[in-house]
Structure formats: structure tokens, C-alpha cells
Swiss-Prot record:
The keyword Ribosomal protein applies. This is Small ribosomal subunit protein bS6. It comes from the Bacteria. GO terms for cellular component: cytosolic small ribosomal subunit. One of its GO terms (molecular function) is small ribosomal subunit rRNA binding. One of its GO terms (biological process) is translation. Residues 110-133 have a biased composition (Basic and acidic residues). Residues 110-142 are annotated as: Disordered. CDD domains: bS6. Binds together with bS18 to 16S ribosomal RNA. The keyword Ubl conjugation does not apply. Keywords: Ribonucleoprotein, Ribosomal protein, RNA-binding, rRNA-binding. InterPro entries: Ribosomal_bS6 (IPR000529), Ribosomal_bS6_CS (IPR020815), Ribosomal_bS6_sf (IPR035980), Ribosomal_S6_plastid/chlpt (IPR020814), Transl_elong_EF1B/ribsomal_bS6 (IPR014717).
Length: 142
């Protein structure tokens, strides 16, 4: 499975129930095609950078997920045919560096420390532990 991020913007004229229904629909598209949603951000109603289809605002939603590449074609097709979707994007994270960035974004969305920070903390702890051992060995030999 590959790592992806998707964001879509819904029309501001939708009522809360319709927004929830659209979000759930796209989440189900991912999971029904054996995708795994790691986390999501419901960003709410925001001003658009520029007018889209006569709208100055839109409802933003972002999801970070893992899926097979074949599922992306269907997801994008469903975005395109839905008149309530003003804009969408699907970003694929491929290289090791990109996947690490994807994990950092997921961790930030979940309010967890990033994987890179955890690795640094573990390394730091290991180095300080080895230093303590060396110090205690040195003091016993005196």
C-alpha cells in the first residue's frame, strides 16, 4: 500500500448533515477499497483564496491514508462527478523522505511527537545511558 493525502472543498451552501454525509461517503470509498485512513482533519468553513464556481468560501476536509494505487482513480472519478465538490487534490508520497514527511503530518494531525523526534529521543537516551555505564565502570576501576 502507498501513502496518500487527500483534501477536498465542499460548497458552503450545504447544511451540516449533507457535509457529514459527503465526508462519510468519501471515507467509505477509501475503506471499501481496502484503504486505511490513518487520520483526518475536519478544517471547517474557510475563505477561498479565489472565487470558485461563484463561491468565496468552502468546507475543507483532509485525510491521510494508505491504499492501493488502483483505488485513487475511482476516488478522483467520484470527486469529479460530485457537483458539491468545488476542488480536490490527492497527493502520493513515494520516496523514503516523502513517507517520513507523511508520518510527521499524521503525527501532527494526531498531536503526537513526530517519528523523527522519537528516534532522536531514543538515540539521545541510548547515548546518555552508555555514558552513564562508562562512567560507572570507570569509577569502579579506581
Amino acid at each position: 500500500m502507498r501513502h496518500y493525502e487527500t483534501m477536498f472543498i465542499l460548497k458552503p451552501t450545504l447544511v451540516e448533515e449533507e457535509i457529514k454525509s459527503k465526508i462519510e461517503f468519501y471515507r467509505e470509498v477509501i475503506t471499501k477499497h481496502h484503504g486505511v485512513i490513518e487520520t483526518s482533519l475536519d478544517m471547517g468553513m474557510r475563505n477561498l483564496a479565489y472565487e470558485i464556481k461563484k463561491h468565496k468560501r468552502g468546507y475543507y476536509y483532509v485525510a491521510y491514508f494508505k491504499a492501493e494505487p488502483s483505488m485513487i482513480v475511482e476516488l478522483e472519478r467520484l470527486y469529479r462527478i460530485n457537483e458539491d465538490v468545488l476542488r480536490f487534490i490527492v497527493i502520493k508520497y513515494e520516496s523514503k523522505k516523502e513517507v517520513e514527511a507523511w508520518h510527521a503530518l499524521v503525527d501532527r494531525a494526531n498531536k503526537k511527537p513526530s517519528h523523527a523526534k522519537e528516534k532522536h529521543e531514543k538515540t539521545e537516551h541510548t547515548h546518555s545511558h552508555h555514558a552513564e555505564e562508562a562512567e560507572s565502570v570507570g569509577s569502579h576501576s579506581e
